[in-house]
């Protein structure tokens, strides 16, 4: 590895993806969590520590209280976030951050004060030689080989629709809802409770998340699927719990992700659906660019990996778009890593060299330099 190889870190609400510029996939993918013992005696005799990070916190989740430093895409706890970055550099990537330029990702509409805080921590705590902060959706677009399009990015904590024209996001047309993967997991737990299964603790919710990721799909025609599930056992699947018990799941498999398309009807939430969000963002843009956006709708983020979501979104947008437009939804197979891959690609370009915020830039201008260099 060359001394100056860039570290690319995609900070998600649920999962951190980290690796090196120019590579096809992140080397480290782990939960963006910090775990602290519920009571100290619970961990006596184990290699007890006051806190655990990432995979280790996940493994010991039964006796830990789990904290997420990033909520709905925005960093809320900087002390814990610093610990996650420290873990990323020294444990996961095994590098010294003062020897590598770093690209960090951020949610669209990230508060200015947060961008400055990220910049300050990277230069002052980790002594990085250079930094760039990139909007997640723009990187997803690059990873799809486009510079114009609209990205529908649904992760664990937040869903955004971000129109991008010639590589620049259009901030006034960005839309967001606090409905994403974690909400789908909680909703699935609610549906399973109605079936007579109880999942309430943070450890049990991890089981529900696994059920959601392995068994859920989006119905192209929800009403027809619902009728079919009442008339037959077509959709029923078994799932084995960690204790060996088998549970059966049926219509919950498609009722859970329907929440993204009908938040009010499914769970009483007065939020825009993902099709409304996408349509609204496009309509907020100049009439001259709308056709390009309709023809390049890019899915990004782990929550868009649910089977059938691309076909359903296409159907919903076609119902709203002008009939003369050929709507296209692009759903790459490994889109949960689209943001990271875009960062890896971007930092590999020779033209990117002039875009870094260097240590000298930071020393001269302070953290506010991020607003000028990282647009």
Curated annotation (Swiss-Prot):
GO terms for cellular component: cytoplasm; cytoskeleton. It catalyses: ATP + H2O = ADP + phosphate + H(+). It holds the Pfam family Actin. Keywords: ATP-binding, Cytoplasm, Cytoskeleton, Hydrolase, Nucleotide-binding. The keyword ATP-binding applies. It is an enzyme of class 3 (hydrolase). It is found in: Cytoplasm, Cytoskeleton. Belongs to the actin family. Actins are highly conserved proteins that are involved in various types of cell motility and are ubiquitously expressed in all eukaryotic cells. This is Actin. It comes from Sterkiella cavicola (Ciliate).
